[in-house]
């Protein structure tokens, strides 16, 4: 477990410095927060996996729970009473504070994290019962890559919009079909990446169900609150694939 704690410390330092640098880019270079926020999104998802190649540890229900708690505490450093006193945290916060999200930025971010990690822990626990924990990476790839690309692609290339709501607000927001397509194609990509961990029937079922289901989850989820829905739907459909495939095996 020593490697796990070292990894978490490195992740905290790197993400904080990255957020600070991107925050300065927002404040002084006029870079859109839509882009800097997603850079942090990618780093949050893929930095730990990169670090694990040097600091391997056995991931499971417990490590995910601890990691989620630590991340929530990291977010707490950016609440207004703290960031107003420390320029480091105030600048870092600028990298994730989209103007259209104000004044709900911290509320939406913190509640999303609090909802996502219990769902992730539950899905990992259930997959452990099948000895198929590795398949959680289908959902992780879609949530990390697909959802990460959806917003910048939508901002840059989105021409076909649809409306979505947000929690605790009557304001309407928009997503794009071009952005949602990123979620769909990342679902196909994720299933193909993990094909070595699935039987032929599981792969066929996964390709038929998971990309569509997760695209719909992202499309209908509240603004900024897509992660809990992606993990819930992605994890549930992955387990569904395992169960349905087992019926074919029995038959």
Task: Please report, for each region that a protein language model flagged, where it lies by residue.
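Interhelical loop and helix-boundary elements at the membrane-water interface
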Residues: 2-7, 22-64, 76-189, 194, ...
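N-terminal signal-anchor transmembrane alpha helix
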Residues: 68-72
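Phosphate-handling active-site elements
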Residues: 196-199
């Amino acid at each position: 477990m020593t490697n796990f704690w070292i990894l978490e410390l490195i992740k905290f330092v790197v993400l904080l410095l990255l957020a600070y640098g991107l925050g300065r880019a927002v404040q002084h270079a006029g870079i859109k927060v839509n882009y800097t926020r997603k850079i942090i999104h990618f780093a949050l998802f893929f930095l730990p996996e990169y670090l694990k190649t040097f600091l391997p540890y056995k991931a499971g229900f417990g490590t995910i729970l601890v990691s989620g708690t630590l991340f929530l505490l990291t977010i707490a450093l950016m609440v207004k009473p703290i960031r107003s006193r420390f320029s480091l945290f105030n600048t870092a916060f600028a990298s994730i504070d989209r103007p259209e999200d104000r004044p709900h930025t911290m509320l939406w971010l913190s509640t999303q994290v609090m909802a996502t990690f219990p769902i992730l822990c539950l899905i990992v626990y259930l997959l452990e019962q099948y000895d198929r924990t590795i398949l959680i990476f289908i959902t992780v790839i879609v949530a990390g890559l697909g959802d990460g690309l959806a917003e910048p692609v939508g901002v840059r290339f989105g021409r076909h919009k649809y409306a979505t709501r947000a929690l605790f607000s009557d304001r309407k927001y928009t997503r794009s079909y071009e952005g949602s397509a990123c979620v769909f194609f990342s679902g196909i990509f994720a299933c193909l990446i993990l094909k070595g961990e699935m039987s032929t029937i599981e792969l066929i079922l996964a390709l038929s169900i998971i990309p569509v289901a997760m695209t719909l989850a992202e499309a209908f989820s509240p603004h900024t609150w897509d992660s809990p829905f992606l993990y819930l739907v992605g994890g549930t459909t992955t387990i569904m694939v395992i169960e349905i495939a087992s019926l074919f095996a029995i038959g």
